[in-house]
Amino acid sequence: MKDIFIVEDDALIAMLLEDMLSDLGYRVCATAPDLERALAAAKDTEFDAAILDVSLAGRSSLPVAKLLDERGKPYLYATGYGSAPEGSTPSTLPVLRKPFQLSELEQAMKLLAEA
């Protein structure tokens, strides 16, 4: 699991996340700042796993999660809200609470790989 798709509406957080993932040996193969681009990339891009912001400019990323479920792609949520969005499929996938440290991201990625 090396190629990661990031869905994040805050450009600074997306860049920080990309840098952190690179430090951990992952490659970010795609990013999307809004729901429409996230859905398009989730359909058309090859990646191993995804990190989804729960809220994209006030819109839930749940449609992206459902598409990833259909494709069998693992993902985790990164959120300042503390939990996955309402309506999420119950799962053992980790939720990364913002703000997070490199060690927390590393642990979440390990859990994601094991899921």
Which stretches of residues belong to each language-model region?
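Conserved acidic carboxylate
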Residues: 8
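Two-component/phosphorelay signaling modules centered on CheY-like receiver
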Residues: 11-30
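A Lys-centered signature of the CheY-like receiver
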Residues: 98
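Active-site residues of response regulator receiver
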Residues: 53
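Acidic catalytic/metal-coordinating carboxylates
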Residues: 58-63
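Acidic, metal-coordinating helix/loop segments flanking the phosphotransfer/catalytic sites
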Residues: 31-49
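Receiver (REC) domain switch/active-site region of two-component response regulators
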Residues: 101
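Hydrophobic/aromatic residues positioned on beta-strands within the core alpha/beta folds
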Residues: 78-79
